């Protein structure tokens, strides 16, 4: 007798929905923390010429065509740290959870945070432990340390700064987590280009620290490249579960090209930080909204009726992220990506119209 799909699929997988990506054609797209600017036209032409030389008939080499060395030089990755590349940071999370999924092992994360920590615990068979943030989205360090002591997790994920809330925890707080954790601590620095601190200087020095980043928020979301730095012992184990040739030759070539022009992306990041400050101030000036501090390229707000404001913005041609309903602490919250000056002006105008 043949079994049905429902009989074959794990019950915990059958019970969830697939990750939903909203259709964005025709919208001002402020839902996914993307850089609003394409490459300058002259760099587009140079990149096209570079990609035309890529040998598409060959697999990528084991070192990523020199990409690891380029990343190390561009982002001051310590010489003591090894590097692993991923098809976006999502794949790096998968590698970590797969490598650590012993029977009974636990993954601990702060909540609310990046949804893929919890999802990958489910996919890999790790027990998930969530530790709530305080109501203002700051870290409850005593509760976190108590949970680490009680649960003895194999891995702790810390989003630094935190998505989807925006604040960056104190460096001393994260150091306390590293000291208390019996296993690996993953510091996810996806938004490092917009933040005032980094743990990259300790990669390879702290034995239980892995620093994870992506080029997506910098302006290269389309090429799907993540990288992580940690002691060589950790990188060696992650490479055992990493699929061969996981980063394709076009991504490698595009990333190496972009790193030669990092000044362009750094200028854009600086402009987005300035726009974030303006947007945050304008949102905070609206008495109907509570705007939370952010060191990322988005601002999270709480509104009296977030679903209604979300629908109003959508009807106005602006797509944002509705957080309401995803976690109790995110009740009536919305996440607004920092866009270009014109996009931010349109967003503010639409919000102001809603409250008239």
From Swiss-Prot:
EC number: 2.6.1.9
Cofactor dependency: pyridoxal 5'-phosphate
Catalytic activity: L-histidinol phosphate + 2-oxoglutarate = 3-(imidazol-4-yl)-2-oxopropyl phosphate + L-glutamate
Bilayer-spanning residue ranges: none
Enzyme kind, highest EC tier: transferase
Keyword entries, A-Z: Amino-acid biosynthesis, Aminotransferase, Histidine biosynthesis, Pyridoxal phosphate, Transferase
Molecular function in Gene Ontology: histidinol-phosphate transaminase activity; pyridoxal phosphate binding
N6-(pyridoxal phosphate)lysine sites (modified residues): 217
Alphabetical GO biological process terms: L-histidine biosynthetic process
Pathways per UniProt: Amino-acid biosynthesis; L-histidine biosynthesis; L-histidine from 5-phospho-alpha-D-ribose 1-diphosphate: step 7/9
CDD domains, alphabetized: AAT_like (cd00609)
The organism's place on the tree of life at top rank: Bacteria
Pfam families referenced in this protein's UniProt entry, alphabetically: Aminotran_1_2
NCBIfam families, A to Z: hisC (TIGR01141)
Family from the record: Belongs to the class-II pyridoxal-phosphate-dependent aminotransferase family. Histidinol-phosphate aminotransferase subfamily.
Subunit structure as annotated in this protein's UniProt entry: Homodimer.
Descriptive protein name: Histidinol-phosphate aminotransferase
Species for this entry: Chromobacterium violaceum (strain ATCC 12472 / DSM 30191 / JCM 1249 / CCUG 213 / NBRC 12614 / NCIMB 9131 / NCTC 9757 / MK)
UniProt lineage: Bacteria, Pseudomonadati, Pseudomonadota, Betaproteobacteria, Neisseriales
Gene name as annotated: hisC
